[in-house]
Design a protein with these regions (language model features):
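Non-catalytic alpha-helical scaffolds and adjoining flexible linkers that form interface surfaces
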Residues: 1-14, 21-204
Length: 204
């Protein structure tokens, strides 16, 4: 089996409870501490086996880390781990997992190889919002429920709000409209992407 580690909880004696996003499900497993075990961390893609035990959760064994081309790039790995960490609270209560999430991460790993990491993640997140039906291309203001036709702001989940309805950073309407339609950040400057990134980190 293969999957991405989206949550790690330490338990007694350096053992871990690990949550893995696989193709069709979220897997929670127990990882015993051992000197010969490979290191694991948030965001790692691993190949693994599960061993059923008398406990409530299976034991994680035969773990092999599947590296990324950029895994030693501090900035890319740091941003990747911050993004991956958001998937656990977002998906933890879902019983049947859509393969979309696994393959979205698979594609993102490849894109990050070639592109600025924050831009790549923001573009991937737009696709996630669209898949979940949460991408508000109607541009109705969250607060006053009137359609936005000029400058706007964005809040958590990239929800659009009239600039006059909030004190948040103002974006050019046409730029955000293009972002939502084309799912590309090439027309946005670095400061705008940085602000989108800060919004994204508030939660998926």
């Amino acid at each position: 089996m293969q999957g991405y580690i989206i949550d790690i909880k330490p338990v007694k004696d350096d053992d871990l409870i690990v949550t893995i996003l696989s193709e069709n499900e979220l897997i929670t497993a127990y990882r015993f501490y051992g000197a010969r075990h490979s290191n694991i961390n948030i965001g790692y893609k691993i190949d693994f086996e599960l061993e059923n035990t008398r406990a409530n959760i299976p034991r994680l064994k035969d773990v092999i880390q599947l590296g990324f081309p950029w895994i030693l790039d501090y900035e890319k790995m740091y941003c990747w781990q911050r993004y991956i960490r958001l998937f656990y609270p977002h998906l933890k209560d879902i019983e049947e997992l859509d393969p979309f999430y696994f393959y979205c991460l698979e594609k993102l790993v490849y894109v990050i190889t070639k592109q600025n990491v924050q831009r790549a993640i923001c573009e991937s997140y737009i696709s996630l919002l669209e898949h979940e039906g949460r991408l508000h291309t109607d541009f109705e203001c969250l607060l006053c429920e009137i359609v936005i036709e000029d400058d706007l702001s964005l809040v958590r989940g990239f929800l659009p709000i009239h600039a006059r309805c909030t004190k948040a950073k103002i974006f050019d309407f046409k730029k955000i409209q293009e972002l939502f339609i084309k799912k590309k950040t090439t027309h946005l400057n670095d400061n705008e992407v940085e602000y989108l990134w800060d919004i994204l980190l508030q939660g998926l």
